[in-house]
Amino acid sequence: MEQKNIRNFSIIAHIDHGKSTLSDRLLEHSLGFEKRLLQAQMLDTMEIERERGITIKLNAVELKINVDNNNYLFHLIDTPGHVDFTYEVSRSLAACEGVLLLVDATQGIQAQTISNAYLALENNLEIIPVINKIDMDNADIETTKDSLHNLLGVEKNSICLVSAKANLGIDQLIQTIIAKIPPPKGEINRPLKALLFDSYYDPYKGVVCFIRVFDGCLKVNDKVRFIKSNSVYQIVELGVKTPFFEKRDQLQAGDVGWFSAGIKKLRDVGVGDTIVSFDDQFTKPLAGYKKILPMIYCGLYPVDNSDYQNLKLAMEKIIISDAALEYEYETSQALGFGVRCGFLGLLHMDVIKERLEREYNLKLISAPPSVVYKVLLTNGKEISIDNPSLLPERSKIKAISEPFVKVFIDLPDQYLGSVIDLCQNFRGQYESLNEIDINRKRICYLMPLGEIIYSFFDKLKSISKGYASLNYEFYNYQHSQLEKVEIMLNKQKIDALSFISHKDFAFKRAKKFCTKLKELIPKHLFEIPIQATIGSKVIARETIKAVRKDVIAKLYGGDVSRKKKLLEKQKEGKKRLKAVGSVQLPQELFSHLLKDED
């Protein structure tokens, strides 16, 4: 295929605006694709994506399109819409020349729409605005056009109108893609230069790499070098996705495809790396994409300690397909060996935990998530803490700083007052208020990340009846009056349950934490005191009463002294159990603790 007939583009949008459905419609227009094979969310290949109805992983496919008897090759990359997976979008854009910016006509522009539009502008990509769901009764097409005009400065009559579900406007959209998105500029005769934008682990092939070839040509048996790791491998097989894996003899400049090279050393493959010929020492690496740092950290521990080695192997494999995931090994006094992982948000954390349990057959306990605090010690040294249990004693701390994020909330006018109150309750600092269109506003607050990772998003959705959308980005670190609250069960500190809270909210949260633990931990044969402490001071307490075994049930009649003897024996046994007995924590304990504190 000549380069002038190739188009590389992504579909970007806010979550649930119809990206995957539009991808399905474009697939139907591909020559040679059998419609009987089509199913909803065709490009969402993970079971968890289909169950949740969201896209988690980017997916690249090749489409053969015929327009006016001219053949074209589309390389479409379907991207996620949730704020936690912005890094997947940034990787997709590095492999494209243009994007379709999709907006739901019933919901209008939302937080992630604006964020994704800015990402495309930063990458100097051609943006085609598309309004979806135009056949819905509550579609507000004119207002959505006005919003897109204000955001991008585009002419209203140039905006594509489609209904992906009803297959309306798709032919016109395809013609617009051909007319507006430029073809790739690479040259086949130049030395090989390709961007590795995604990868995953196959138990038979090793690491399978997804690449965009910018210059040159890649063939089976070619030797290639990863610039960052300086590793050399020989290509075993290569091809494209249609969306099924198809083998090819070569990939050339402008193509988006995959290759396998028997790569078993997982650390040799880094997403964002540049691939060149093995003897090429002069080609400079591509810009790749911006590395995104984790926002929250959480410990994952196997329920059965014998699964620890399996967890280590699973983490090594899963990180290949998730460039934003970070982890290190750690030990908890209460939960044993595990890994401490860095995630981009709570949804990212839930997805990784669920993938580990499903794909690698592990049963895991997750500790409450935490953010990274910067601690200035009295000796002048500054340290970073992502685990509350590692916070030094108060006497050794001069100051603690916590991360603040800039939060953008798009919402209808009628919920503005309630959402402002919510932000204030979460220690928000007002920044700005702007009008999106006649009925919608965008407010901006500076908020502590540690406050919003728990229940802020759920409360926002509840207050706004689901109409508010949220996006956030790291802003800075600010000094705060924070305290470490430690939880003791049966007078033993449980390090995995420690948390850091602002001193104004410490008592209230500790009290609710203890109450929840009392509800979640099953009764034992001995009484269990639950205490929340700051330093040596107990600030909250609950008690789980002992379950009573009826030791005198087997007696009938007889001397009362026999009954007393059995009751005294039970009393002594419970005293011993209380001294040496261990408290069994249920697997679902920590996930329930993360839910709304009200």
From Swiss-Prot:
Q: Which UniProt keywords apply?
A: Cell membrane, GTP-binding, Hydrolase, Membrane, Nucleotide-binding, Protein biosynthesis
Q: Do you know which Pfam families this protein is assigned to?
A: EFG_C (PF00679), GTP_EFTU (PF00009), GTP_EFTU_D2 (PF03144), LepA_C (PF06421)
Question: EC class of this enzyme?
Answer: hydrolase
Chain sites annotated for binding GTP: D16, H17, G18, K19, S20, T21, N132, K133, I134, D135
Predominant cellular place of this UniProt entry's protein: membrane
> What domain of life does the native source organism fall in?
Bacteria
**Compartment(s) of residence:** Cell membrane
Question: Domain tr-type G, which positions?
Answer: 4-185
Role, per record: Required for accurate and efficient protein synthesis under certain stress conditions. May act as a fidelity factor of the translation reaction, by catalyzing a one-codon backward translocation of tRNAs on improperly translocated ribosomes. Back-translocation proceeds from a post-translocation (POST) complex to a pre-translocation (PRE) complex, thus giving elongation factor G a second chance to translocate the tRNAs correctly. Binds to ribosomes in a GTP-dependent manner.
Protein name (record): Elongation factor 4
Gene that this polypeptide is encoded by:
lepA
